[in-house]
Amino acid sequence: IPMGYCYPGKGSSGDLPPRRECADLWLDRLLANLPNIELTLLIGHYAQRHFLGKAASGGVGKTVAAHAQFAPNRIPLPHPSPRNVAWFMRNPWFEKELLPSLRRQVRAAMRMDFDRNP
């Protein structure tokens, strides 16, 4: 679920941040109608800041590195943008350690959903 459904426009270094009033208007109402969420992937700074608050104040890199403290229900991830290729190259542990764990957790969450809703 995105932080905003409206495109905020382009800024000097990429897309502008999602508009705060968009999430304030609809996000809690939408999540209230999804009571069986087993796993939340917090992709990028804005989602991490919204859901983790001060725990995400060190930036995306530090928040993702501390992913174990948010497990098993929330996993902070960097945005998979081409602009982040350098980050992925500087952090090989992400692909070697976090991604295999993430894949297992997603498979487990999907199995739980299929078990509940055959």
Q: Each PLM stretch: what is its role?
A:
Residues 2-118:
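Glycine/proline-rich loop-helix segments at beta-alpha junctions forming the active-site rim
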